[in-house]
C-alpha cells in the first residue's frame, strides 16, 4: 500500500514536470538542417534540443491520423521501433534500435489527441510506469516529448509536422546530433508515407 502511494506520488510529479512542447510558438528561432521535400529544423526550448520535420503528403488527414494513433502497430510502420506495448489507454512503452555501436533507446509516454476543424494533433510526454522498468541494453529517454500535427490543405493533401525532443542521452556524441536529427526526421516521414501506400 505504501509503495503504491509512493509510485502514484512520483507519477504525479513526473506529469507536473514533464517536458511539454505546447509552448513552442511561431516566433521561436529555428536553425534549418534541411530544406527540400522534407524540411528539418532545430531549436532550443527549455534547454532541450527540439527538432521538427515537415512535409506534405498527398493523402487525406483522416487516413494519416489512423496510422499515427495506432501505436501498437509502430514496429510495422517506423522501422527503428522494435517494440511498442500499450500500458494503459493513453500510455505506451516504445523501444528503439540504434545504429551500431550505440545502445538502444526506450521511453514511456502519455499521449493526448485533439481534433479541430482542419487539424489533428497527437501530443506526448514522458511518464514513468511500474510495468516498464528500465531494460538492460537500453537508455531510457526520460524527457521524451513530441507532437504530430496534421493540417488539411484540401481533401487530398495534408501538411504533416513531427516535432520531438532530440536529446539522445547515453553515449551518443554531441558532434553527431545534427546528422542523427536529419536521419530521424527523414526516416519518420519516409516510413509514414510508405505505410500509407500499402
Could you say what each language-model-derived stretch is?
Residues 2-9:
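Sec-dependent signal peptide recognition
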Residues 19, 106-155:
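Hydrophobic-ligand binding "helix-grip"
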Residues 10-18:
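Hydrophobic h-region of N-terminal signal peptides that target proteins for export
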Residues 18-89, 159:
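Hydrophobic ligand-binding cavity/cleft-lining segments
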Amino acid at each position: 500500500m505504501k509503495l503504491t502511494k509512493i509510485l502514484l506520488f512520483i507519477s504525479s510529479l513526473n506529469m507536473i514536470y514533464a517536458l511539454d512542447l505546447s509552448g513552442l510558438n511561431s516566433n521561436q528561432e529555428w536553425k534549418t538542417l534541411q530544406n527540400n521535400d522534407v524540411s528539418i529544423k532545430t531549436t532550443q526550448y527549455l534547454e532541450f534540443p527540439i527538432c521538427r520535420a515537415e512535409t506534405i503528403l498527398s493523402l487525406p488527414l483522416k487516413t494519416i491520423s489512423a496510422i499515427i494513433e495506432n501505436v501498437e502497430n509502430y514496429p510495422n510502420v517506423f522501422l527503428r521501433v522494435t517494440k511498442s506495448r500499450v500500458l494503459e489507454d493513453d500510455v505506451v512503452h516504445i523501444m528503439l534500435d540504434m545504429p551500431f555501436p550505440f545502445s538502444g533507446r526506450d521511453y514511456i509516454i502519455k499521449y493526448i489527441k485533439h481534433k479541430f476543424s482542419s487539424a489533428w494533433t497527437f501530443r506526448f510526454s514522458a511518464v514513468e510506469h511500474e510495468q516498464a522498468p528500465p531494460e538492460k541494453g537500453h537508455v531510457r529517454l526520460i524527457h521524451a516529448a513530441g507532437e504530430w500535427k496534421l493540417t488539411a490543405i484540401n481533401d487530398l493533401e495534408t501538411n504533416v509536422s513531427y516535432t520531438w525532443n532530440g536529446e539522445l542521452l547515453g553515449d551518443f556524441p554531441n558532434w553527431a546530433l545534427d546528422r542523427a536529427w536529419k536521419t530521424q526526421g527523414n526516416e519518420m516521414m519516409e516510413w509514414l508515407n510508405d505505410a500509407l501506400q500499402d
